[in-house]
Amino acid sequence: MAQGPSCASELHYYRALDHANAGFATGTYHLKDDLHLATPPPHPSEAPVVNPNPLATVPTPPTSGVKLSLVSVGQRNKLPVFTSKEKVTAPPFADGNPALAAIPTKDGLKRRKPKNNIIKSSSSFVSRVITHEASSKRLNDRNPDGLFAFANINRAFQWLDLSSKNKEEPLAKILFTKAHMLTHDINELTKSSSHIDIAMGSSAGDIIWYEPISQKYARINKNGVVSNSPVTHIKWIPGSENMFMAAHANGQLVVYDKEKEDALFTPEISNHSAEAMKASSRLPLQVLKSVNSRNQKTNPVALWKLANQKISQFAFSPDQRHLAVVLEDGSLRVMDYLKEEVLDIFRSYYGGLICVCWSPDGKYIVTGGQDDLVTIWSFPERKIVARCQGHNSWVSTVAFDPWRCDERTYRFGSVGDDCRLLLWDFSVGMLHRPRAHQASARQRTSMIASNTQHFNRHRADSASNRMRSDSQRTADTYNDYDSAVRHPVEPRARTALLPPIMSKIVGDDPICWLGFQEDSIMTSSLEGHIRTWDRPREGINDSYNGNTSSPAISTSAAGSGSGIADSAMGSL
């Protein structure tokens, strides 16, 4: 395992919630692995860049660094009870549209696979596929509870076995011709020891449905026939075997079905008057094709336009009804995606928002952005809870640690272009607004609550309007749809500030992904470093069984937030 020369050898975090009787055990995270994936060179058909000029205006393919997806096909330890999905009561997406009802086939319950063999592919989109010579033996001999990792890095996509002694040797590696893979996701519902469904989005707008065990694939949105813009984020819709959602750089959210063919997309509002079209374009969500449409023979299943700027990321809520979307225009938009409507719009302090996630119980949304801040939003109260200051550059990923969350206290992490990994603990009781503004804050909260009740009634009325046929819609009808609550930016002086419990530089290049496992924390970077830190083990001191030379991140009690892990962070 290649270990980065300046990678943090230890991660120390400090308990910042002692005064609130919250927080979790302190300890040391020891660096277990530092796996380096090589960045593939440009395809030979591309003209080489002889003298790269940082001021050049020539467009280059967008990149996203290394993004990981982890999956275990065995009975690996499940998520904590706190993240249980037993409370999900929302109906499945597209439920009630007979045009999208599953059609029985002669295959019965057998999982369908893509039709094309990617190894033998003659497509100009795929350059080359390299498989491990002993991949079949490795798959048969491995522990089914071990982790597979799928990683995209520029025009390469790799399949790794993290439970193998030779984890640096991929089971398969796909090289695409010119397009860069920017995002991908695994369908947790359909995974098994013989089948894994992966959707990946490219800088060309094309989407690949890939099944790695059979090495079969299908190409969706070929040549941008539905949306000709790079795919910035992609996720399988919770509870669906076939449908996934893709965010495009042109501000569109598109729902695709892996089983459907593509067709040239024409907006289903094109037969409306110019006045109605103009009114529709001003909505926070312009429905260009509804999931309730009976025209469902081809992709897309649904297509929504949110803005004219890039959608950075989105996240599904644990209740499988709501969607949090962050955009380059600096907005956080919370949707009821089952009803196809925007409920609330929040704004960053300044600059675009880059990343978003939900707390395991669905009560909080956390965002990170170009203002170098991490922000906590309360979903039930529809307001900002705290701004988290600690990064020195753009925040690229935020994620909750489900093994360190309970009913009272939450832990999440963030990484960014400043090469830092930060950990944060918070509970509602520890967050206090400045006293001078508490009265006005209560007044604003009551106003928002009353407005929310008004808009909830308005949403019920506008929902009934959706029963009208498309030909009956007028400009006034579209204006009636705009029931989103637009929240003003809360001044920094009125917002609680939360310090991190740990801040550490963990590499030399920007960190672009963060993931939590029961026994470890993982990060990946722009230049291909995948690092794994073992969690502190209860009852074992910081000597880590006597091996004090092991690289690590360490945590120790430091009173009520007075000790911050990295003094170079500055005043919080």
Swiss-Prot record:
InterPro entries named among the record's database cross-references: WD40/YVTN_repeat-like_dom_sf, WD40_repeat_dom_sf, WD40_rpt, WD_repeat_creC_regulators
Annotated Gene Ontology cellular component terms: cell division site; cell tip; nucleus
Keyword entries, A-Z: Repeat, Transcription, Transcription regulation, Ubl conjugation pathway, WD repeat
Entry keyword annotation includes Ribonucleoprotein: no
Keyword Membrane listed: no
WD repeats: 226-266, 306-347, 348-387, 390-434, 506-543
Low complexity bias locations: 549-572
UniProt record, GO biological process: carbon catabolite repression of transcription
Annotated region (Disordered), positions in chain: 36-61, 458-486, 541-572
Known role: Component of the regulatory network controlling carbon source utilization through ubiquitination and deubiquitination involving creA, creB, creC, creD and acrB. Required to prevent the proteolysis of the CreB deubiquitinating enzyme in the absence of carbon catabolite repression. CreB deubiquitinating enzyme stabilized in a complex with the CreC leads to the expression of genes such as those in the proline and quinate pathways.
The protein's assembly and partners: Interacts with creB.
The family this protein is said to belong to: Belongs to the WD repeat creC family.
Name of the protein in its database record: Probable catabolite repression protein creC
Source species of the chain: Aspergillus oryzae (strain ATCC 42149 / RIB 40) (Yellow koji mold)
Gene designation: creC
